[in-house]
Amino acid sequence: MGINIRSMVQNNFLKTIILAGWLTINIYLLTSTYLLYYKSDKYHYLYMVLKESICVSRACAMAINFNLALILIPMCKTIISWIRTKLLKYLHSNPRRLVNHLKGLHILCAFTMCILSVIHTLSHLVNSLRFHLNFTEAIEAINVASSKKETTLWLVLSKVPGWTGVVMLVLLAIIVLTSFQAVRRQNYEVFWYTHHLTIVFLILACFHGFGKITKFQTNLDKNPRECHSLVRKMWKENSTICLEAPSFESNVPQTWKWIVGPLCLYIIDRIIRLFRAVKDCQVANVQ
C-alpha cells in the first residue's frame, strides 16, 4: 500500500504542479483584471456606464488570452518530440512522461475557453445593452454608441469585436463538437479538417480587440474621480480640482501578443512536418 501511494505521488507530482500552476494563473488573471476595472480610477467612467458586466467581460478575455497561448503548444508535435528525445533523455522519466501527456493540457485549455467564451459573450451583450440605455451626451466619448438611436443588435454586429466574436464562437463550437470521441471514431477526417479552423479562430482573435470598445481616462490629474458628479455642469466654475472635462483613449489590443509566439512555433512545426512528408525515403536494408 505504501509503495503504491509513493509511486502514485512520484508519477503525478509534476502533473499536479503544472495543473496547480495553470489554475493559479487563471484565477490571478480573472481576479486582478476584474478588480482593475472595478476599482481603478482610469476606468471609473466606463464602470459608471457598464457596471459589473465590463469587469466580467474583460476578466474572461484575459484568461482566454492565457489559454489561447497554451493551447497551440501541445499541437507542436515535432518540436515536443525533439525536446523529449534530445533535451530530456538524460533526465528522470517524469519530465519525459509529462511531455507525453500534454494532450490533456490542450483539452483542458479548450474546454476552459469554451466556458469563458460563453460568459465573455453574454457579458458583452449586456455591455452593448447598457451602452444603448445609458447613452448621454455628457460623457459621449466613453460610449461606443454614437447616438441613442443605435440598438443593441446594431452595436454588436456593426463593430469589429461584435461580428468577429460571433464568428469565433461558431468556429469554437464546430471545433469542440467535432472533437468528441464519438465523432473521431466514426469520421476522423471531420475532426482533422475542422480542427484546422483553429488557425482561422486565432487570426480572428488577433483582430478581435481592434474595435476600441474599452476606453480609459487619460487626464486624471485635471479631472480626478471626484469630478464624475459634475459631468453635467461647467467644470471650471464648480470646482478648483475639476479643471477640464474627462478625456479618454482606447485600450491597445493585447490578444495578438499572447498568440504570436505559440503561433510562430506551430507554423515552424508544420513546415518541418511538411518537409519530412515530401522528403524522399531511401531503403537502407531489407531482410
Task: Annotate each PLM feature.
Residues 1-287:
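FNR-like FAD-binding dehydrogenase module
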